[in-house]
Amino acid sequence: MLPFEKNSRIVFCGDSVTDVNRDYTAVPAGWGSFGDGYVNLVHALLTAVYPDRELMIMNEGVGGDDIKLMAARWDRDVLDMKPDYVSVMIGINDVWRHFDGPFRQVDLVSLDEFEHTYEDLMGRTEPRVKGLIVMSPFMMEPNRDDPMRAMVDRYAEVARQVADRHGATYVDVQAAMDHFLKKQSSYILSMDRCHPGIEGHMLVARTWLQAVGFDWERTTFDDEK
């Protein structure tokens, strides 16, 4: 059963996979604010199927963020929005920089720092919201021995552990991607194994909605019963 009460505020935060061309100048939950990815699809389905709930969806994803960059703006981007629920998907850039960053001398995020920072954010947020939703970072790479995929799995496991400690709903996006990749190539979903196209975003949105109890049989008239 969908847990979100009427007029709930749901903030989504993360990196470019959450951001996806959102208009930073738009008012929260206004035109252009949702981006072109899974957040927009979640918003559209919740609005169409649960019009009686009048849910406010806010996209606070920022392209390029790792967990430290996201944490630096947490108060402004998340807590100041007074959310009832917070959904987080972070980690792919924390991993990716280990592979594309050495010649740029970027500041890398270790697994321990990732866990410590994630734990701090969830610990600060849990008492102020009705619910937390933690989404796994993911990579559209079926070979689990691929070095980057293997590291993504380790960071995703940390995210799962943090979610468990804080009673958060855990959305295993990687598992959904792995199931798809048993049937089709990663190039159906992404050109770089990390940034989904619209098909990939639909898979992310569907996985998120299933995890939170979206009723796929509900009609737009059920609120009249």
What is each of the regions a protein language model found here?
Residues 2-32:
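Short glycine-rich His-centered loop
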Residues 3-6, 36-56, 65-224:
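Alpha-helical cap/lid subdomain in secreted, periplasmic
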Residues 61-63:
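Short, solvent-exposed turn/loop segments enriched in Gly/Ser/Thr/Pro and often Arg
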